[in-house]
From Swiss-Prot:
Cofactor (UniProt): Zn(2+); Mn(2+)
Binding site for Zn(2+) 2: E145, D179, H216, E261
Lineage: Bacteria, Pseudomonadati, Pseudomonadota, Gammaproteobacteria, Enterobacterales
Subunit field text: Monomer.
Source organism of this protein record: Escherichia coli (strain K12)
Catalytic activity: Endonucleolytic cleavage to 5'-phosphooligonucleotide end-products
EC number assigned by the record: 3.1.21.2
Keyword DNA repair on entry: yes
Single GO molecular function: 3'-5'-DNA exonuclease activity
The protein's role, per its UniProt record: Endonuclease IV plays a role in DNA repair. It cleaves phosphodiester bonds at apurinic or apyrimidinic (AP) sites, generating a 3'-hydroxyl group and a 5'-terminal sugar phosphate. It preferentially attacks modified AP sites created by bleomycin and neocarzinostatin.
UniProt induction comment: Endonuclease IV is induced by agents which generate superoxide radical anions.
Binding note for cofactor: Binds 3 Zn(2+) ions. Can also bind Mn(2+) ions.
Protein name, UniProt field: Endonuclease 4
Keyword set, alphabetical order: DNA damage, DNA repair, Endonuclease, Hydrolase, Manganese, Metal-binding, Nuclease, Zinc
Binding site for Zn(2+) 1: H69, H109, E145
Length: 285
């Protein structure tokens, strides 16, 4: 079964994220559990936790259908010790918030070397950051998102994801989220079913589908291999509809949150309905 939704706003209270997801007939959703552009947030209150859990129960969202995202400020591969510790503390807090809310996944961007350390050293720091967070939490899986490779961001190669996983001690609590726009911008072609087959065969060999815990379904304003992260509405960008139809018809993508981060929230309900319909359409030639 496909879980299909969008990254919805939690403005006015975390419970509102579940309500907003239900309003667009989503069977999955993503959210920030705190302001994503601030380091600190007030601790979750018992009322906030209870209201969020009640809303999820009311609208039939289990933790398997929810893919929270951490703060954009966090860099788990930071080359400077003081800044690395600040990011690690913030990431632990994000993981603990998920644990309190009964959520089992936390999606994050791996990190950046800032041209100050090697890719290998940065990837090792990211893995160690995950190990520290896993040691201080229970029941939450750290879900590494692939990136477009802008600037010094790592995670734009499947090999980067594999290297991080290799350095994580508890393999049962690490996974990946593949963003289609990021993959395309990083040089993984998705424009035809044949290219999708090739890209995900590469993913299967390098990382493995057992680690796939979520996806971000985004078309791309950015061009192929540009290393630029610019999302677009489904079918409106340089990837096109075929990739998303192909994903909907492949059971390897069942049972994980498939999350829209497309640029027009006003048509999310239409995009979700279209994705759902593709599951029963005739397979792409």
């Amino acid at each position: 079964m496909k879980y299909i939704g969008a990254h919805v706003s939690a403005a006015g209270g975390l419970a509102n994220a579940a309500i907003r997801a239900a309003e667009i007939d989503a069977t999955a959703f993503a959210l920030f559990t705190k302001n994503q552009r601030q380091w600190r947030a007030a601790p979750l209150t018992t009322q906030t936790i209870d209201e969020f859990k009640a809303a999820c129960e009311k609208y039939h969202y289990t933790s398997a259908q929810i893919l929270p995202h951490d703060s954009y400020l966090i860099n788990l591969g930071h080359p400077v010790t003081e800044a690395l510790e600040k990011s690690r503390d913030a990431f632990i807090d994000e993981m603990q918030r998920c644990e309190q809310l009964g959520l089992s996944l936390l999606n994050f961007h791996p990190g950046s070397h800032l041209m100050q350390i090697s890719e290998e050293d940065c990837l090792a720091r990211i893995a160690e950051s995950i190990n520290i967070a896993l040691d201080k939490t229970q029941g939450v899986t750290a879900v590494i998102e692939n990136t477009a490779g802008q600037g010094s961001n790592l995670g734009f190669k499947f090999e980067h994801l594999a290297a991080i996983i290799d350095g994580v001690e508890d393999k049962s609590r690490v996974g990946v989220c593949i963003d289609t726009c990021h993959a395309f911008a990083a040089g993984y072609d998705l424009r035809t079913p044949a290219e999708c087959e090739k890209t995900f065969a590469d993913f299967a060999r390098t990382v493995g589908f057992k680690y796939l815990r979520g996806m971000h379904l985004n078309d791309a304003k950015s061009t192929f291999g540009s290393r630029v992260d610019r999302h677009h509405s489904l079918g409106e960008g340089n990837i096109g509809h075929d990739a998303f139809r192909w994903i909907m018809q492949d059971d390897r993508f069942d049972g994980i949150p498939l999350i829209l981060e497309t640029i027009n929230p006003d048509i999310w309900a239409e995009e979700i309905a279209w994705l759902k319909a593709q599951q029963t359409e005739k397979a792409v030639a």
